[in-house]
Amino acid sequence: KEELRAASASYTAQEFNLLNDLNNLTINGRKLEEHEKRIIIDKVKTSNTINMRKIIADVMGEKIEEFYGARIDKSEKEIFHKMEVYNKMRKALAEIHVNIEEFSRENLDEIGYILTINTDKEAMMEAFEHANVKLSEEIKDCLISLRKTNGALFSKWHSFSLKIMKELIPEMYQQPKEQMTLLTEMGVMRGQMDKFEKNKYIPVDAADEDIFNPVVRRAVRISFKILNALMK
């Protein structure tokens, strides 16, 4: 499962995305230090309202004079990943007197996966029965209710697997580098290129293995087979 694309709702994917946002920033002429990134992420995980500029300024202990590198939306407004699924889950669990910090990274990753790959209550309950993480009926009902009212947050898959993100995250804390730079330096991108560089044709099975929608997968396979036929 760690080799598959991760659920965007997994804890690891949320931390990875926020770290990538932070590493893209240059503030007052410098990059964020490791300890600053850790404190910022802790604040994002525990705040009820999140103002990223304010959190960053408070952690840096500086007034922000220059701020570059943030992603922007169509209205030119800065946007950041804010661990939205984690925070909604934290608040929902708190209502039934459960502390989200009782769950490990692996627990939260598995919960995120189950709530993403399944869409109906029966399937989710069955998945929880077979999961490594053991939950009470009250917690299961809480999580399923959260998923029902926030379906869009549990409908996406990340570009990377849990395995790759877990390898990158320690480096992303230590170095002010974004994901693609680190992937190239660590040889992950090169490894993917080497994997197929001797292929004369598109390896259909390998190329579509991360596509989960069966209709889309079939369309992609047909397209690749046509391209391969044209290259013969």
What is the predicted role of each segment?
Residues K1-K232:
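Long, compositionally biased intrinsically disordered regions
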